[in-house]
C-alpha cells in the first residue's frame, strides 16, 4: 500500500509471503490454513497501527474504511458461493482479507483473480500435471530433510481427490499483480 508509505511496502511483502504459503498449501492439499489467514489479518492490523502511530492516520483510516467495505462484500458473496459448493471456505476468507488490504484496488484484484481462475479452468490438464509434480517433489524434499509431510499431496492421490480448483493460486496471482502494480497504467 503506497498510501501507507515505506512501512506499507514492508507489510505488503510480509502479506505476499503469507499468501504464497496459502497458495502452495492450496495447490498441495486443497486447504488454506486458518493460520495463514489469521496471520494476514494480524499483519494488516500492525500496518494500520504503524501508519496511525507514524503520523499517517489519514491513510490508515482511508484503508480501514474502503477495505472494510470490500472485505464484507467479498465475505457475503463468497459465503453464497461456498453454500452452493462453488468456492471453498478458505478461498473466501483469503479473498476477503486480501480485499481489505487492496482497498481501493479491490475491484481490480477481484477481476484479476477471476480471470486467472478462468485461465486455470482452461489449462486444467496442465494444472493437474503441475499438482502431481509439485506433490511428488514436496514429498521427496520432506523425506530428504527428515520431515515427511503430514498428509499426501492431492496431486498424488489423483481421481476424485483432485476434484475442484486450487483457487488460492488465482487469489495469490491477482493479489500479487495488484501489489506490484502490473496493471496500474491501465486502470
Could you describe each region identified by the protein language model?
Residues 1-187:
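A membrane-topology feature that recognizes alpha-helical transmembrane segments
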Amino acid at each position: 500500500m503506497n498510501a501507507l508509505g515505506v512501512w506499507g511496502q514492508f507489510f505488503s511483502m510480509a502479506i505476499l509471503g503469507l499468501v504464497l504459503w496459502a497458495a502452495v498449501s492450496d495447490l498441495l492439499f486443497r486447504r488454506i490454513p486458518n493460520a495463514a489467514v489469521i496471520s494476514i489479518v494480524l499483519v494488516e492490523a500492525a500496518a494500520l497501527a504503524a501508519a496511525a502511530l507514524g503520523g499517517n492516520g489519514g491513510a490508515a483510516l482511508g484503508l480501514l474504511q474502503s477495505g472494510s467495505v470490500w472485505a464484507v462484500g467479498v465475505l457475503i458473496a463468497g459465503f453464497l458461493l461456498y453454500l452452493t459448493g462453488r468456492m471453498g471456505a478458505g478461498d473466501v476468507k483469503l479473498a476477503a482479507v486480501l480485499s481489505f488490504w487492496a482497498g481501493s484496488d479491490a475491484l481490480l484484484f477481484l477481476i484479476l483473480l477471476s480471470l486467472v481462475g478462468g485461465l486455470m479452468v482452461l489449462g486444467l490438464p496442465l494444472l493437474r500435471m503441475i499438482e502431481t509434480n509439485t506433490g511428488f517433489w514436496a514429498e521427496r524434499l520432506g523425506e530428504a530433510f527428515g520431515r515427511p509431510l503430514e498428509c499426501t499431496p492431492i496431486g498424488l492421490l489423483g481421481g476424485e481427490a483432485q476434484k475442484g480448483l486450487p483457487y488460492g493460486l488465482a487469489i495469490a496471482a491477482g493479489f500479487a499483480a495488484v501489489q506490484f502494480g502490473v496493471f496500474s497504467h491501465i486502470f
